[in-house]
Swiss-Prot record:
Entry GO CC: CBM complex; cytosol
Positions of post-translational Phosphothreonine modification: 231, 531, 533
Name of the protein described by the UniProt record: Caspase recruitment domain-containing protein 9
Keywords, alphabetical: Adaptive immunity, Coiled coil, Cytoplasm, Immunity, Innate immunity, Isopeptide bond, Metal-binding, Phosphoprotein, Ubl conjugation, Zinc
Record keyword Phosphoprotein present: yes
Source organism of the structure: Mus musculus
Length: 536
C-alpha cells in the first residue's frame, strides 16, 4: 500500500493527519480487522475498548495509533487497509489514491439486496474455486498414487537387483570356498601321496634290508656248513691216524733195524780184512743189488707219494671248488628264489595298487557324477527360483497395473461425480430468486438465533464454512458408490437440499451482519461528516 520503506517516515507522514484521524475514526469498527491482521492482540484491544481511563473516543483512537506505531511497517499497512475498507474518503485524503476495495460503500450504494447478491456471488466463486481445487487435489492424489505405484515398482526392481547382487556375492563366496576346499583337498591328496610314496620307499628299503640280512644269514649258514665239513674231515683224519701201539711196534721195528744195521756195520768193519773172500763179494754184490732195488723202490715210493700228494691236493682243490660251486649254486638258487619272491610281492603290490587305483578312479568318477548331478540339480533349482521370481514380479507388476487402473477409474468416477454436482449446483443457481425469497421467512427465526453465535467465528475464519462444505461434499462423494445403500438420485437430491439450506442460512447470517454493520456505518459516517464539517 505504501511506497515508503522506513517506518519512521511512514508514521511521520500520518502525523500531519493525526487530528483528522482521531476525529473521524471509530476504534470499535477497525479493531476486528486489525486483530485479524495480527497487529493487535486481545490485550491491546481490551485496553483500547474497555479501559475506564479512555472514555473519550478520540483518546481511544490516539492510544490505538500509538499501539500501531509500535508495530512498525506492518501496523502502518494494516491501518491503511482498514481505512481503505471502512473510511474510503479518509483513505483518499491521506494517501491521495483511490481505494481498490469499496466494501463500506456497498450498503450505501446497493442496499442489503445488493450486498446479499455480492455475497452470494463471492460464495459461488469460492465454491467453484473449492471445487476446482478439489478436482486438482483428486488429480494430484491420483498422480501421487501413480507415482507411489511407480515407486513401488522401482523398489521391487531395486530389491530384485539387490537380491540378485546378494545371490551373486553368495555364489562367488561359495565358489571361492569350493576352490579353497578343492585346493586344500588337492594339497592333502598330494601330501598323502607323498607320504604313501615315502612309506613305499621305506617299505622297499626295509624289504631290501630284510633280503640282504636273509642273504647274509644264508651265506653264514653256508660258511658254517663248510666249516662243519672241514671239522668232520679233520675228525676223520684224526680217527684214521695210527694208534699208539702201532707207533710203538713201528718204533721197535725201527730199533731192530737200526741194531741190525749196526751189527752189519760192525760185521762189515770186521770183515774188511776178508773182503777178498768170494763169500764176501757175493754178499756185497747182493747188498748192492738190494740197495739198488731199495733205492728204486724208495724212488718209486717217493714218486708215488708225490703223485698221491698231488692227487690229494688236486682232489682237495676240486673238492673245495665243488663245494664253492655248490655254495654259489645254492646262493644263486636262494637269490633267484628271493628275487622271485620279491618280484611276486612287487607284482602283488602292483595288482593291489592297480585295484586301489581303479577303486579310487571309480569313486572319483562317482563323486564327479554326483557333483555334476548336484550342480545340475542346483542349476535347475536356481532356474526354477528365478522363473518363479520373474513370475512373481510379473504378477506384482500386473497387480500394480491393475491397482493403477483401478485408481484411475476411481479418479474418473470421482471427477464425473464432481462434474455432476457442479452441474446440479449451476442448475440450482440458475433457478429464480423468488423461491429463495419465499423460503427465507421460514428459517428466519432459526437463522437469527444462529447468527449471533456465528458472527465472531465467521470473522475469525471466513473460509471455515467452505471447508466444512468441502468436507461434506467429499464425504458424500466418497460415500457414493456400489456399496452405498441409497440410490444415486436420492443421494443427489439430499445433497442439493443440504447445500441449498446451507446457502440460505449463510445468506441470512451475512445479511443480518451486514445490516448491523450498515447501521453502525451510517451512524459513524454521519458523525464523521459532522466532525468534518466542524473541523473544516
Amino acid at each position: 500500500m505504501s511506497d515508503y520503506e522506513n517506518d519512521d517516515e511512514c508514521w511521520s507522514t500520518l502525523e500531519s493527519f493525526r487530528v483528522k484521524l482521531i476525529s473521524v475514526i471509530d476504534p470499535s469498527r477497525i479493531t476486528p480487522y486489525l486483530r485479524q491482521c495480527k497487529v493487535l492482540n486481545p490485550d491491546d484491544e481490551e485496553q483500547v475498548l474497555s479501559d475506564p481511563n479512555l472514555v473519550i473516543r478520540k483518546r481511544k483512537v490516539g492510544v490505538l495509533l500509538d499501539i500501531l506505531q509500535r508495530t512498525g511497517h506492518k501496523g502502518y499497512v494494516a491501518f491503511l487497509e482498514s481505512l481503505e475498507l471502512y473510511y474510503p474518503q479518509l483513505y483518499r485524503k491521506v494517501t491521495g489514491k483511490e481505494p481498490a476495495r469499496v466494501f463500506s460503500m456497498i450498503i450505501d450504494a446497493s442496499g442489503e439486496s445488493g450486498l446479499t447478491q455480492l455475497l452470494m456471488t463471492e460464495v459461488m466463486k469460492l465454491q467453484k474455486k473449492v471445487q476446482d481445487l478439489t478436482a486438482l487435489l483428486s488429480s494430484k492424489d491420483d498422480f501421487i498414487k501413480e507415482l507411489r505405484v511407480k515407486d513401488s515398482l522401482l523398489r521391487k526392481h531395486q530389491e530384485r537387483v539387490q537380491r540378485l547382487k546378494e545371490e551373486c556375492e553368495l555364489s562367488s563366496a561359495e565358489l571361492k570356498r569350493c576352490k579353497d576346499e578343492n585346493y586344500e583337498l588337492a594339497m592333502c591328496l598330494a601330501h598323502l601321496s607323498e607320504e604313501k610314496g615315502a612309506a613305499l620307499m621305506r617299505n622297499r628299503d626295509l624289504q631290501l634290508e630284510v633280503d640282504r640280512l636273509r642273504h647274509s644269514l644264508m651265506k653264514a649258514e653256508d660258511d658254517c656248513k663248510v666249516e662243519r665239513k672241514h671239522t668232520l674231515k679233520l675228525r676223520h683224519a684224526m680217527e684214521q691216524r695210527p694208534s699208539q701201539e702201532l707207533l710203538w711196534e713201528l718204533q721197535q721195528e725201527k730199533d731192530l733195524l737200526q741194531a741190525r744195521v749196526q751189527e752189519l756195520q760192525v760185521s762189515v768193519q770186521e770183515g774188511k780184512l776178508d773182503r777178498n773172500s768170494p763169500y764176501i763179494q757175493v754178499l756185497e754184490e747182493d747188498w748192492r743189488q738190494a740197495l739198488q732195488e731199495h733205492q728204486k723202490q724208495v724212488s718209486t715210493i717217493f714218486s708215488l707219494r708225490k703223485d698221491l700228494r698231488q692227487a690229494e691236493t688236486l682232489r682237495a682243490r676240486c673238492t673245495e671248488e665243488k663245494e664253492m660251486f655248490e655254495l654259489q649254486c645254492l646262493a644263486l638258487r636262494k637269490d633267484a628264489k628271493m628275487y622271485k619272491d620279491r618280484i611276486e610281492a612287487i607284482l602283488l603290490q602292483m595288482e593291489e595298487v592297480s585295484i586301489e587305483r581303479d577303486q579310487a578312479m571309480a569313486s572319483r568318477e562317482e563323486l564327479h557324477a554326483q557333483c555334476t548331478q548336484s550342480f545340475q540339480d542346483k542349476d535347475k533349482l536356481r532356474k526354477l527360483v528365478r522363473e518363479l521370481g520373474e513370475k512373481a514380479d510379473e504378477l506384482q507388476l500386473q497387480l500394480f497395473q491393475t491397482e493403477s487402473r483401478l485408481l484411475a477409474a476411481e479418479g474418473r468416477l470421482k471427477q464425473q461425480q464432481l462434474d455432476m454436482l457442479i452441474l446440479s449446483s449451476d442448475l440450482e443457481d440458475s433457478s429464480p430468486r423468488n423461491s429463495q425469497e419465499l423460503s427465507l421467512p421460514q428459517d428466519l427465526e432459526e437463522d437469527a438465533q444462529l447468527s449471533d453465535k456465528g458472527v465472531l467465528a465467521d470473522r475469525e475464519s471466513p473460509e471455515q464454512p467452505f471447508m466444512a462444505l468441502n468436507k461434506e461434499h467429499l464425504s458424500l462423494t466418497h460415500g457414493m458408490g456400489p456399496s452405498s445403500s441409497e440410490p444415486p438420485e436420492k443421494e443427489r437430491r439430499r445433497l442439493k437440499e443440504s447445500f441449498e439450506n446451507y446457502r440460505r442460512k449463510r445468506a441470512l447470517r451475512k445479511m443480518q451482519n451486514s445490516w448491523r454493520q450498515g447501521e453502525g456505518d451510517r451512524g459513524n459516517t454521519t458523525g464523521s461528516d459532522n466532525t468534518d464539517t466542524e473541523g473544516s
